[in-house]
A protein has these predicted regions:
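Active-site substrate-recognition segment that forms the wall
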Residues: 43-51, 55-95, 180, 220, ...
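Rossmann-like flavin
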Residues: 86-209
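C-terminal catalytic lobe of FAD-dependent flavoproteins
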Residues: 164, 305-306, 330-332, 346-434
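Predominantly flavin-linked oxidoreductase catalytic cores and closely associated redox partners
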Residues: 151, 155-184, 191-280
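N-terminal Rossmann-like FAD-binding beta1-loop-alpha1 element of flavoenzymes
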Residues: 2-28
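Glycine-rich FAD pyrophosphate-binding loop
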Residues: 21-41
């Protein structure tokens, strides 16, 4: 079968790799000059099953109100005269109940753990080098109330098989001595031994190279303009995708199946077909610093809960990323938010890096209100979805690619996840006190 994959980030490239492994003819289309040039370019570097608690949780509404108007707030909702933003916001609030949060955690843990194991197998199979470290992820807290409120979600994750173990402040510093300078401010933490870190850009580029060598055709500098369809109801299908190629010519490409893996831009592509995805861009920031004093820089990947920042050591670089700005599709850098990242990183590790020459970056995370992605079938028989991975694209990417390849090939993915367009039954779970 001939399959066209739209998008070459970690999700699209993984989809292409597994589709090719299953014997399909695969074409990947992306508007950038190479793979992983947008949201997969410079994220926080964490493969973090332990980050399964979504932004939408019972404590979120009050926090969002408290942070309104603060330019350096971890989650900044900047109201716009835009119906989709407000509709997304209302759906976000609906996901903040304990019951919805618990079910979303279950879904996210399932696909994330499946993806972590898939990534490990891919690493062993391909030998791709991407500055990966399998040293776990350490969350630390500087607010007792926030630490206490994290315990129910951590317990639920443990019950679901994610070993997110709560530890005291002394154990936090024992595991990561680079935090010794703020020991008096740390109230506790949790450590997930099976989590990892690595450079998603390096990995995706490496996988794209190997996929191309295996016969996947990549068409870069090529813009997708629309999808053509025919028929209605059960007989509806996509007949082709209109593109503008690298020479500026309009063309229509045909295939048997199409995979939409265009992140935040998936929503606008599919809307003319009557497919409404609840995806809105969440602008995330990262800063990359050259490490000048390796002994002072952290080795374990960290999550600073109070500032909603993640820290990953990528070879001789330190990547610090986080925050979320709900403010449309603009990718311009906000100076206040950039400076807040450097200020906090310097507080944590004052002698570790060259803080005078940071490399700042923004990317648009494709956020669903629940943080659960769309993976699976659409109402159009030969159109498939692999999008909406939010803050966990790197964590979920490899497994999402493997799962969509199975679905297109008529197979049942080996993971208990609510794939779109497929029957799914799961036991009801409730978020309980720790």
């Amino acid at each position: 079968m001939k399959v066209i994959v739209l998008g070459s980030g970690i999700v699209g490239t993984s989809s292409a790799w597994f589709l090719k492994k299953q014997g399909h003819e695969v074409i990947v289309i992306d508007r950038q000059p190479g793979a992983a040039q947008e949201t997969s370019f410079a994220n926080g570097g964490q493969i973090s099953v332990s980050h399964a608690e979504p932004w939408a949780n019972p404590s979120a509404p009050l926090k969002v109100l408290k942070w309104l108007g603060k330019e350096d707030a971890p989650l900044l909702f900047r109201p716009r005269a835009e119906w989709l933003q407000w509709l997304w916001g209302m759906c976000f609030l609906r996901e903040c109940t304990p019951g919805r949060t618990a079910e979303n955690i279950r879904q996210i843990v399932a696909i994330s753990e499946y993806s972590r194991l898939t990534l490990r197998s891919l690493r062993e199979e391909t030998g791709i080098q991407y500055d990966n470290l399998s040293k776990g992820i350490l969350h630390f807290y500087t607010d007792q109330k926030e630490f206490d409120s994290s315990l129910p979600a951590a317990k639920l994750m443990r019950d679901l098989g994610c070993p997110r173990d709560s530890i005291d402040a002394d154990e936090v510093v024992r595991r990561e001595p680079a935090l010794a300078g703020i020991r008096d401010k740390i109230v506790g933490g949790d450590y997930t031994e099976t989590d990892e870190s690595g450079d998603v850009y390096q990995f995706t580029m490496g996988l794209a190279d190997k996929a191309a060598a295996a016969g996947v055709q990549f068409q870069f500098n090529t813009t997708v303009t629309r999808l053509f369809s025919e028929g209605t109801g059960a007989s509806a299908k996509i007949t082709g995708v209109e593109i503008i190629d690298a020479t500026g010519r309009h063309k229509t490409l045909h295939a048997d199946a199409f995979v939409v893996a265009m992140g935040s831009h998936s929503q606008s592509l599919l809307k003319p077909l009557g497919i409404s995805l609840m995806i809105y861009p969440g602008k995330g920031y990262s800063a990359t610093y050259q490490i000048t004093n390796p002994d002072q820089a952290p080795v374990i990947s960290l999550t600073d809960d109070g500032y909603k920042l993640v820290v990953s050591r990528l070879g001789n670089r330190l990547r610090v990323a986080g925050t979320c700005e709900i403010n449309g599709y603009g990718r311009e850098l906000n100076t206040a938010r950039c400076e807040a990242i450097t200020r906090r990183t310097r507080e944590l590790f004052p002698h570790a890096c060259d803080y005078d020459n940071p490399v700042y970056w923004t990317g648009l995370r494709p956020l669903t209100p629940s943080n659960v992605p769309y993976i699976g079938k659409s109402r159009i028989s030969n159109l498939f979805l692999n999008t909406g991975h939010g803050t966990l694209g790197w964590t979920m990417g490899a497994g999402s690619g493997r799962a969509i390849a199975d679905i297109i090939s008529g197979l049942q993915p080996d993971v208990d996840f609510a794939f779109t367009g497929m029957q799914h039954q799961a036991g009801k779970i409730v978020l309980q006190p720790a």
